[in-house]
Amino acid sequence: MLLSKYFLPVLKEEPSEAQVTSHKLMLRSGMIRQQAAGIYTWLPLGLKVLKNIENIVRLNMNKAGALEVLMPCIQPAHLWMESGRFDNYGKEMLKFQDRHDNTLLFGPTNEDMITDIFRHNIKSYKDLPKNLYHIQWKFRDEIRPRFGVMRGREFLMKDAYSFDINEENAVKTYNQMYKAYINAFRDLGVFAIPVIADNGPIGGNLSHEFHIIAETGESTIYYDKKFKTLKDNPDIDVEEIKSWYAAAEEKYEVNKLPISEQEITSSKGIEVGHIFYIGSKYSVNMNALINDEYGKLTPIEMSSYGIGISRLVAAIIEANCDEKGIIWPSSVAPFKVSLINLNIHDSKCVELAEMAYKELSDKNIEVLYDDTEARPGSKFATHDLIGSPHQIIIGPKKAANNIVALKDRKSGVIEDIEVGSLMSVL
């Protein structure tokens, strides 16, 4: 992509309305723009990141055997009345009437609707297990939306729902999804800690939250110091990780620790995923019954699995940034390479830049080619801000000798590379 043809409305100054780093950087780098309190338009750069995260999550759900569906944003209120949640959910639920006076709502979650789909289409234990997921926009009318997309009113979620004949099988499915979550966050290039947690309004009695460590996190989590080894050794077996202690603040009890208090550390975390074993709460209330192997009608056992796709964008930035801007993990970066031509009027610079651009594009490496008239200092500031993992810098002096500079955004290390060797280094 040529920067001269791209839509990248960067801001030089910090926006006064932004409180946390991710919100500031998302506005400054031209990823989003606010349309109303807690509601944002995703501009090209931000949407690329959002789609990259979405695709990685989708891949891991598919690997876990989950099947993708797409449920509507707008839900009939009678399903929520039937499940018993309509009056209990509170003012966060946006409700309205259509022209026929039917009460509808903008779905904040989908347990009720997926239970309705299940009960009308699956009747026998022979059709189990089933695990269905969708990626859809949700709305919760937060009383005080803040921190940009971290706590907005409109947000993109991946929600999965599993159905099993009994608790034993349901827990097996839950454990499979736990592993899928660990793998998904690894693939996203983030360090997420699974902690024992409360189920909240969803219900149920088995639950884990997944937190990314960040100083701006709203929750305090307590965890075994072994988790810190995940940063340097991401290939640790998931079963081993599952045996390590980690708990949300409301579940942390010093006198009931399975390991010594000295082995525990605490950090602020941003919750980016939550999985629940719900049991038969919804199936009982909504009469979602199936025939078991003895022909007896029995309520289905359910679990729910959520990942905040749009929130992840902000959380990843909080954990991967410096004073200059964003430092994207390669897996989610909107562009893997920023190609910076410092003098677009120098024929040799143009020759090397176009050569590199073609080679990168031919290898399906996403590259943003800065072919603008901006000054070198402005170009460096822009590309440090948007956070491409690698920068190829082409200036007249080195270009004369077929040399380009390759900068690693995370370490800041710059090395001179002969242009013909560029692809082997990248």
Swiss-Prot record:
Source domain of life: Bacteria
PROSITE patterns attached to this UniProt entry: AA_TRNA_LIGASE_II (PS50862)
EC assignment: 6.1.1.15
Principal EC category: ligase
Catalytic activity: tRNA(Pro) + L-proline + ATP = L-prolyl-tRNA(Pro) + AMP + diphosphate
Gene Ontology molecular functions: ATP binding; proline-tRNA ligase activity
Keywords from the UniProt entry: Aminoacyl-tRNA synthetase, ATP-binding, Cytoplasm, Ligase, Nucleotide-binding, Protein biosynthesis
Location of the protein in the cell: Cytoplasm
Protein's GO biological process: prolyl-tRNA aminoacylation
Oligomeric and partner information: Homodimer.
Functional summary from the UniProt entry: Catalyzes the attachment of proline to tRNA(Pro) in a two-step reaction: proline is first activated by ATP to form Pro-AMP and then transferred to the acceptor end of tRNA(Pro).
Protein name as catalogued: Proline--tRNA ligase
The species this protein was found in: Rickettsia peacockii (strain Rustic)
Lineage summary: Bacteria, Pseudomonadati, Pseudomonadota, Alphaproteobacteria, Rickettsiales
